[in-house]
Amino acid sequence: MLLYLLRHAEAVDHAESDAVRELTDKGVAQAHKVGKYCRKNGLIPAIILTSPLKRAEQTARIVAKEIPNAEFIVEPTLRAGMQPETALEELRAFSNFKSLMLVGHEPDFSLLAAHLLGTPLREIFHLRKASLTALELDALRPGVATLQFSIPSKLM
């Protein structure tokens, strides 16, 4: 399976709650850029799973509009603060897909990437807003992933 990790695009710093923080104009542009980059380069996930937090869901919707036949599902376990083991458990329900995109948060995605790569967290990179990281997995278990790429939106 090819697993794409997409950190949500830039969001406003303050709102009545963290769950309702929306994308800034720059964040909307970043999300469109990611979606176009995916389409242009054939990075087409079979399905997009997104955190229920507003900024992640907005990012996923925009990216999905840029990708042909992209379906996305709001996945409550992807909310900020998820644990890698919990994410793996949820991903097992989608293990029959060749590719999958998760849209979510930091430091959750760095923790998940480190867990899947079998790398200590201090040796893994920090995923920037609107960055796209791809991991190749032969199985959904710790330590078996291979990093394919990690690219920030400003380089897309």
State what each model feature region is:
Residues L2-M82, E89, E123, L127-K129:
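Active-site-proximal alpha-helix that buttresses catalytic centers in soluble enzyme cores
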Residues A9-E10, K54, L78, E106-D108, ...:
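Short, flexible active-site-adjacent loop segments at beta-strand->alpha-helix junctions, enriched
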Residues Y37, I62, E66, A93, ...:
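Active-site catalytic microenvironments for nucleophilic, acid-base chemistry
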Residues I67-N69, F97, P142:
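Short, well-ordered coil/turn elements that cap or connect secondary structure elements
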Residues R92-L102, V144-S153:
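A polyampholytic, Gly/Pro-enriched intrinsically disordered region
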Residues F94-M101, E106-S131:
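Non-DNA-binding regulatory cores of transcription-related proteins
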Residues L117-Q148, S153-M156:
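Domain-level recognition of soluble alpha/beta enzyme cores
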